[in-house]
Amino acid sequence: MKILYSLRRFYHVETLFNGTFVLAGRDQETTGFAWWAGNARLINLSGKLLGAHVAHAGLIVFWAGAMNLFEVAHFVPEKPMYEQGLILLPHLATLGWGVGPGGEVLDTFPYFVSGVLHLISSAVLGFGGIYHALLGPETLEESFPFFGYVWKDRNKMTTILGIHLILLGIGAFLLVLKALYFGGIYDTWAPGGGDVRKITNLTLSPGVIFGYLLKSPFGGEGWIVSVDDLEDIIGGHVWLGFICVFGGIWHILTKPFAWARRAFVWSGEAYLSYSLGALSVFGFIACCFVWFNNTAYPSEFYGPTGPEASQAQAFTFLVRDQRLGANVGSAQGPTGLGKYLMRSPTGEVIFGGETMRFWDLRAPWLEPLRGPNGLDLSRLKKDIQPWQERRSAEYMTHAPLGSLNSVGGVATEINAVNYVSPRSWLATSHFVLGFFFFVGHLWHAGRARAAAAGFEKGIDRDLEPVLYMTPLN
């Protein structure tokens, strides 16, 4: 009878309908894994696994470059980015490339350069991936011991972790350098409606930076998602950069303590599960950030947040009716509460009507009209600028409400356009990906723990009906 498992390891296997199928010598009989199990066949082949990872990086970078050029080719400067279904150009614009006051795109050439650089990089990665997958050594331990590893070698694994942390720290510092020295980044809070500026007064106080982590995640607090000035964002990246770099050096120079050796499972599949768990957390945080935060994700490029569009509608009609003679300070709505303005339970003046639920919105077009006790009535009567009216009217009709294949905007709004907000796309995709990565984390963690406990995973295949059926071919 066929052996349905590898003698070299205790991974469960799937049985091919056609057991004679062989793929480049890495077949089920020799590896314990069917062809569709992909990189699982390469668990003990460090050279081939390197090729798979480099090729994967090439695919990722190729998508970034190709999609970047696709968005450049379709970009219409006269329309806002968020009305054109763009998800990459807003990121480049946020970094200060190609834009000027008010988020107006002045030059698309930097976006073209970005796309070409990514395409060239993807070609290099692609060739490297193909080389290591097909031509390079199957294992690295003999020829290149620095790059070789054994999954159970705890010291080597933490060294690899340290190298990754240092690279992440360098990435954080690159943003800091761009903001401080290389042209600055886009600040939606710059006076007059946003502009590109260099960050000159970093927030480095640990009380402020780490205070975000201690905040409640709920309304009015908002955990780290509530950050609303670039000094805090860039200062946070300085802290993150140092933590990652010094943490990386620590992990390279030290060996895991006894408690860590006991607490963790030390196998390739366990490391996969840890990585998927971390990516899941990142996905959920990114979802909340892009949905609620209009500083890291400026509304000029990504469209308004949900609360921002709602408050913009209240503001737009306050402006209109005030011009028509309404006394916005005292007019009553159908419920007896203020039609345009009302007081929150804590006494602040806020917009009335249904948008009262979004009382804690902060947006650059609205904040100049606030006083010490909320919205200032005298400023609402005398100080509203044309750019604030234009921006709120635009945001009112571009709420991030549409499902991914619908006519977006507010369903009852006659001025709505066929539009889906990039915030909807990015928040939805990151939530869904975060969820699936979490499921993958649970799956691989369960398998890794079972293997470490020493029992076979999967079900007994001996009596599986498919084994007695005629092959499909």
UniProtKB/Swiss-Prot annotation:
It is found in: Plastid, Chloroplast thylakoid membrane. The modification Phosphothreonine is found at residue 15. The keyword rRNA-binding does not apply. The chain crosses the membrane at residues 69-93, 134-155, 178-200, 255-275, 291-312, 447-471. The keyword Ion transport does not apply. [CaMn4O5] cluster binds at residue 367. One of its GO terms (biological process) is photosynthetic electron transport in photosystem II. It holds the Pfam family PSII. GO terms for cellular component: chloroplast thylakoid membrane; photosystem II; plastid. GO terms for molecular function: chlorophyll binding; electron transporter, transferring electrons within the cyclic electron transport pathway of photosynthesis activity; metal ion binding. Keywords: Acetylation, Chlorophyll, Chloroplast, Chromophore, Manganese, Membrane, Metal-binding, Phosphoprotein, Photosynthesis, Photosystem II, Plastid, Thylakoid, Transmembrane, Transmembrane helix. The modification N-acetylthreonine is found at residue 15. Binds multiple chlorophylls and provides some of the ligands for the Ca-4Mn-5O cluster of the oxygen-evolving complex. It may also provide a ligand for a Cl- that is required for oxygen evolution. PSII binds additional chlorophylls, carotenoids and specific lipids. Residues 1-14 form a propeptide. One of the components of the core complex of photosystem II (PSII). It binds chlorophyll and helps catalyze the primary light-induced photochemical processes of PSII. PSII is a light-driven water:plastoquinone oxidoreductase, using light energy to abstract electrons from H(2)O, generating O(2) and a proton gradient subsequently used for ATP formation. Belongs to the PsbB/PsbC family. PsbC subfamily. PSII is composed of 1 copy each of membrane proteins PsbA, PsbB, PsbC, PsbD, PsbE, PsbF, PsbH, PsbI, PsbJ, PsbK, PsbL, PsbM, PsbT, PsbX, PsbY, PsbZ, Psb30/Ycf12, at least 3 peripheral proteins of the oxygen-evolving complex and a large number of cofactors. It forms dimeric complexes. This is Photosystem II CP43 reaction center protein. It comes from Oryza sativa subsp. indica (Rice). The gene is psbC.
